[in-house]
């Protein structure tokens, strides 16, 4: 098992557990404006780093300076100005996709972007203090207006502050979320204006602090464009498909999927990636001069890049419109453009995550499109299990790194509609079939895989303030045309087959408007299921039926398969929302070594999982003499 065994590593594990509990701690979200908007707070670890930076900046700005002495106000103005200028390199370093901080800290540029925004806000605060002390000094002589109108240095400094204020305000999440494309464009334009204004404002002897961030930006761009040229120029790659351009490497096909989702497929890509990474995708023929980050939903062994992109607005909406218009299934007259594909450009891959193969247990939780991140992680471990079972991976020193120490995987996917099951229907069935084959090949196979899919009609997928009584619909399998209703009572599992076309009174019917399927009203789709092993069945189809696909139905049962528990042979489908604390606790109770908890989804789900991990780490006294092993948490956030 993946656990420390020596005194040194036990001590290190204890310190790590304490730091993890502190850094992952967070408070409950704040709901304002009659529950129409929710403010999600960051975890304590990043907040402490930002506070430490702020305190350091303030101490350096006011060191040995008396703010009550009117004759020191000018000195404070100079001091805060120089300290503000010295912050520019850090801000630009945190903004680049290729930077040494991310390399040394093992963090992706997406994780550092949060620090970039708060470092910029610290810069704004320092610049504001710098300006206010100069204004305060001039106000004694009623000289502020005169300086702003007549002094060129003051004009340039005030212009730089105004531009910085605009950048900080437009970078607030509600504003930048209005339009990704507009935000990126105005951010680049205002950045150039800010740098020019600062360069004109500061003395010549300190302009080096302006040239440093410019150099960092140039390095980032040169590195990105050089790597992008190697990745996208066909001269460096051989396109095995023979369908690509003679100049460019990548050609993509666009297919519309249920729930306004576009599947983008690039055969034989010119990059190498790991599970959980993402790339920036550009298609100038559909969305010109735009580059959007998308998670890679496939593995390198698939020999293709696959993306599932939800149509929101802007570029993603145009991608779905193009796919729908040119798809043959939708009745398009001229489908040649879709079959021929479009030239696309790929930048990346980006993203860092510890290999989950080194952990004893792994809990993967996804909300909606978050499965594009967790599904490749599941498939990556399961593929190693399969190769080990077949004897394709040896035990030599050169092969050891390819082995997986993972003994059990718990996969949870929360979706708003049964139609979304089609996104990863094939992958789920393949993984479950491979694990079942491993168990048939080796009756005492020690690895465990449990998959649960929660269908909820809650648009936000946010957990309620207090857990409700556990109620839900449980089905087994991925095809809704022939569902199995399961009642789970402790260790006994009873399966009742129900045809989706049956006219039985127990058949699920849509809930009336204003009423729910629960006795007291409300809908079971929004009920939080505390324990899957204690479920009372109820009928609810507010999420709509899934589309059956005869090509990927589970294979018929055989005599050998009867010995395999149903839960391990097909996913458990429930109507409701998960209770992460119970799910994670059950895995930790079985773990013999360090466990990994990975979540990707809406902020509500991520916050709930984060609080659950902190609570369980404290409850179980991880690495504090109880024998409970460590918990590694990785939160992959949505948005930008």
At which residue positions do the language-model features occur?
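Membrane-proximal cytosolic interface modules of multi-pass membrane proteins
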Residues: 166, 173-176, 185, 189-199, ...
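Reductase modules of NAD(P)H-dependent flavoproteins
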Residues: 111, 307, 312-316, 321-323, ...
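Membrane-embedded alpha-helical bundles of multi-pass integral membrane proteins
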Residues: 15, 19-226, 231
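Extended, low-complexity, polar regulatory segments
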Residues: 1-37, 304, 528, 541-569
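Non-transmembrane, juxtamembrane loop and terminal tail segments
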Residues: 2-31, 234-262, 468, 473-478, ...
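FAD-binding FR-type
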Residues: 266-363, 379, 385, 389-393, ...
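Acidic, Ser/Thr-rich intrinsically disordered and amphipathic helical segments
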Residues: 75, 84, 88, 99, ...
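Classical protein tyrosine phosphatase
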Residues: 81-82, 110-131, 211, 216, ...
């Amino acid at each position: 098992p993946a656990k420390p065994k020596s005194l040194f590593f036990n001590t290190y594990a204890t310190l790590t557990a304490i730091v993890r509990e502190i850094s992952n701690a967070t408070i409950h979200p704040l709901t304002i404006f009659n529950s129409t908007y929710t403010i999600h707070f960051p975890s304590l670890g990043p907040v402490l780093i930002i506070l430490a930076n702020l305190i350091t900046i303030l101490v350096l700005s006011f060191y040995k300076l008396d703010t009550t002495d009117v004759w020191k106000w000018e000195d404070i103005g100079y001091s805060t100005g120089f300290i503000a200028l010295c912050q520019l390199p850090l801000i630009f370093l945190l903004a680049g996709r290729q930077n040494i901080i991310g390399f040394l800290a093992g963090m992706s540029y997406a994780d550092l972007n949060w620090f970039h925004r708060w470092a910029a806000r610290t810069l704004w605060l320092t610049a504001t203090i710098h300006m206010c002390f100069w204004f305060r000094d001039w106000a004694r002589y009623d000289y502020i207006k005169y300086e702003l109108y007549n002094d060129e240095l003051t004009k340039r400094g005030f212009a730089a502050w105004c531009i910085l204020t605009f950048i900080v305000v437009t970078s607030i999440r509600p504003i930048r979320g209005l339009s990704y494309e507009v935000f990126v464009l105005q951010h680049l334009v205002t950045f150039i204006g800010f740098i020019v204004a600062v360069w004109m404002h500061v003395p010549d002897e300190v302009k080096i602090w302006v040239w440093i961030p410019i150099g960092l930006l140039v390095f980032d761009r040169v590195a990105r464009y050089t790597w992008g040229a190697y990745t996208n120029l066909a001269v460096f790659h051989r396109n095995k498909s023979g369908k690509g351009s003679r100049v460019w490497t990548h050609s993509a096909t666009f297919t519309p999927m249920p729930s306004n989702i576009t599947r983008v497929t690039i055969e034989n890509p010119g990059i190498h990636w790991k599970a959980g990474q993402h790339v920036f995708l550009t298609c100038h023929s559909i969305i010109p001069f735009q580059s959007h980050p998308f998670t890679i939903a496939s593995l390198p062994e698939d020999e293709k890049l696959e993306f599932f992109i939800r149509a929101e607005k802007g570029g993603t909406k145009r991608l779905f419109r193009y796919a729908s218009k040119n798809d043959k299934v939708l009745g398009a007259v001229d489908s040649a453009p879709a079959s021929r594909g479009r030239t696309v450009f790929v930048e990346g891959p980006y993203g860092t995550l510890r290999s989950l193969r080194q952990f004893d247990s792994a809990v993967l939780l996804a909300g909606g499109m978050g499965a594009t991140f967790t599904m490749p992680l599941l498939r990556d471990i399961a593929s190693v299990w399969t190769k080990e079972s077949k004897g394709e991976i040896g035990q030599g020193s050169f092969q050891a790194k390819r082995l997986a120490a993972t003994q059990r995987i718990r996969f949870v996917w929360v979706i708003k509609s049964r139609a979304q099951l089609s996104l990863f229907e094939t992958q789920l069935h393949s993984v479950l079939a491979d694990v079942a084959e491993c168990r048939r090949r080796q009756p005492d196979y020690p690895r465990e895989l449990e998959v649960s899919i929660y269908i909820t009609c809650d648009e936000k997928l946010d957990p309620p303030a207090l857990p409700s009584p556990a109620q839900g619909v449980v089905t087994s399998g991925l095809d809704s045309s022939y569902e199995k209703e399961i009642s789970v009572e402790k260790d006994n599992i009873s399966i009742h087959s129900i045809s989706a076309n049956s006219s039985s009174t127990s058949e699920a019917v849509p809930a009336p408007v204003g009423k729910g399927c629960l006795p007291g009203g409300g809908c079971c789709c929004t009920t939080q299921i505390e324990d899957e092993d204690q479920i009372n069945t109820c009928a609810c189809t507010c999420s709509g039926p899934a589309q059956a696909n005869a090509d990927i139905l589970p294979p018929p049962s055989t005599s050998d398969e009867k010995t395999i528990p149903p839960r391990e042979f097909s996913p458990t489908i429930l109507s409701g929302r998960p209770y992460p604390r119970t799910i994670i606790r059950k895995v930790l109770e079985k773990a013999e070594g360090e466990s990994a908890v990975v979540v990707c989804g809406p902020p509500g789900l991520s916050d709930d999982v984060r609080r659950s991990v902190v609570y369980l780490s404290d409850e179980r006294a991880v690495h504090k003499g109880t024998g409970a092993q460590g918990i590694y948490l990785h939160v992959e956030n949505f948005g930008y």
